[in-house]
Amino acid sequence: MKKLACLSLALTFLAVAAGGAALAPAPVAAQAKTIVWNLPTVAAPTYYHTVNYNAFAAKLKEKSGGRMEIRVHPASSLYPGPELIPAVLDGRSAVGTVLASYLTDVLLEMGPLELPFMTSSIEEHKKAALQLRPFYTEMLAKKGLKLLSINTWPSQQIFSSVPIRTVADWKGKKIRVYGADSANVTRLLGGSPVNIAFGEVYSALEKKTVDGAMTSATNAEPMKFFEVAKFLDYWYLAGAAQEWLVANQKAWDGLPKDLQQAVMDALKDSNLEEKEWQDAAAAEERTRKRLPELGMTIVDPSKEEMAKARQIAKAAWDTWLQRTGPDGKRGLELALQALGR
């Protein structure tokens, strides 16, 4: 009898224990894992792009309650410049930047505003770029990309070891370029284009591999180009150079709806797009004043030389139209319409 009582007590204990276990919270084998997207950029760690992307990332972490993070990788530390577009196209990067500097046949039609001498200021470029948003959205969607934000670099100038004041001064000069259009206009103006990744510009100027480098004047200080080039030639080859922040569409579709909304809210609350254009204009103005302090000489070609260069560069537009087909033609028409021409 005693044995039966003990057995009954033991069974009761086991039943209670089992029930308690069922009521206890299940061990969190793996709490919902934080979704991490890596965002590569060619911009230096202190450059406004990097600062703005980090602010956007911080806002996203806040909006998602820590469920999603974007980690910014500056100064080509994740992928070199020419790899940025392929990386987001093939999904190695769920989020990335499409730089006008690296547009290829894959997305060349995105660049009507990047044609040589199309715009002459950041303000003019911005006005047209924002009107072209539906066109950009459509072109990116064709390649499996979702447009998040239209951003910009400042105007494109020439760092050089000798002054380039006239069209004649371009003759025979080896100029670092960053894509098909900049290569074409350099050739038309009499120079020899050399494709060099952004991260290699400093050493190319230092070793005299090139006589000059086409890029934004605002890179003088953060990239220390002032150490290896003594002249900044203000040819305004482009009033600005766009950078589109995009997501790989498959990666985007894989996000829960609330996280998609968190991304859009973070873009809005960080004011990323507007901040980019404001910072570009401020950086350009600040750089112009700063260059002499860095020991650089500013070269302003005459109006006559600029007009001559623009006329010569028109041939580059024809080449671009031939390569981009109907989409390019439509994009150019939209760009000219937006600019009131």
Specify the residue positions occupied by each region the protein language model found.
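Short, low-complexity disordered leader/linker segments with a strong preference
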Residues: 1-36, 341
